[in-house]
């Protein structure tokens, strides 16, 4: 499937619907396209499946300039428009709350869009880069994060070199409604822990349905 951003970029997406009527919608944002990121990474497949099983209509998409999406890579800045368009498209599938999930680069973009988008009911940030971040925009300031009211999940691997646990917990303290999950025995890519991480995201997302 395809959908279009407010600045006219056509994006490639894939929609996964639950077996019954959807209870909510979810958007999944992938890692840095300059480092091989796309909607088809194993951790994102696991999350997509988990959310669909829990009743969400799930839209995974490729950022501009990635795979079959149009446009050119915007360094994480114009990509917020991609997330906004994906949220709008996903919400056509369900009347319930919309959860946005981002991994790595996608977590950075998802966070910055969510701060400006009151359609986002919950936000899951997986491996949000807090170290080695020269090629993506800065994480918003604690004062900006404090203004975000919806629940936020910060998930990282125990050995994540981009999202070390102390920095993740420090960042979490800036949010009003944070939850932290550290997955043991894995790194930024969550190898061999995909299902465990997906279950954590799924449980968090499902909690938004009752809010």
Describe each PLM feature range.
Residues 158-178:
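Conserved loop-alpha-helix segment in the C-terminal half of the alpha/beta-hydrolase fold
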Residues 173-189:
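Catalytic histidine neighborhood in serine/cysteine hydrolases
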Residues 27-33, 127, 156, 184:
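The conserved beta1-alpha1 loop
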Residues 147-149, 154-156, 160:
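Short beta-strand/loop motif that positions the catalytic acidic residue
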Residues 71, 186-198:
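Catalytic histidine-centered segment of alpha/beta-hydrolase-like enzymes
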Residues 9-93:
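Serine-hydrolase catalytic machinery in alpha/beta-hydrolase-like enzymes
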Residues 83-147:
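Primarily recognizes the serine-hydrolase "nucleophile elbow" in alpha/beta-hydrolase
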Residues 132, 158-163, 188-189:
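Acidic catalytic loop of the alpha/beta-hydrolase fold
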